[in-house]
């Protein structure tokens, strides 16, 4: 399979931009990868998940056929009856954050909870606490809004 992949990178003209690693995925160091492709049974995906979650935020993970259970994919596609899943490694954002709003008003406090790329929390500003709405975490990019925001 690795030889097949190498040939395809040459045919596509990207061989100088791709490194194909052939080996035991639980032994090889692929921590610098920007894309990891998997075709592993579900239990192996789950064994590998802690290692994947330590990778640089923004790293893309693609799996043929098998998902990661409670870690919902960022995207699902199908080819016939075969699903494909992709995830983007999220930054760890859970915790307490304090910042000064752009208008220079009193400091605001943001309390975030996180499960993979799913984020929720509360924003306390001017003595009022409210939930963050529509939070989206994609790699190291977090966006949300709150009542009173434009």
What are these regions (language model features)?
Residues 2-32:
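S-adenosyl-L-methionine
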Residues 45-94:
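C-terminal substrate-binding/active-site "lid" region of AdoMet-derived donor-dependent transferases
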């Amino acid at each position: 399979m690795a030889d097949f992949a190498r040939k395809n990178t040459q045919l596509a003209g990207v061989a100088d931009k791709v490194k194909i690693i052939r080996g035991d995925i639980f032994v090889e160091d692929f921590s610098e990868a920007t894309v990891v492709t998997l075709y592993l049974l579900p239990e192996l995906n789950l064994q590998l998940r802690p290692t994947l979650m330590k990778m640089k935020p923004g790293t893309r993970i693609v799996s043929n056929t098998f998902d990661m259970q409670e870690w919902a994919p960022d995207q699902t596609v199908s080819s016939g009856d075969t699903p494909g899943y992709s995830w983007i490694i999220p930054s760890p954002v859970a915790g307490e954050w304090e910042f000064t709003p752009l208008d220079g008003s009193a400091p605001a406090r943001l309390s975030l909870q996180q499960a993979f790329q799913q984020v929720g929390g509360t924003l306390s500003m001017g003595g009022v606490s409210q939930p963050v709405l529509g939070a989206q975490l994609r790699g190291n990019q977090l966006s949300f809004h709150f009542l009173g925001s434009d």
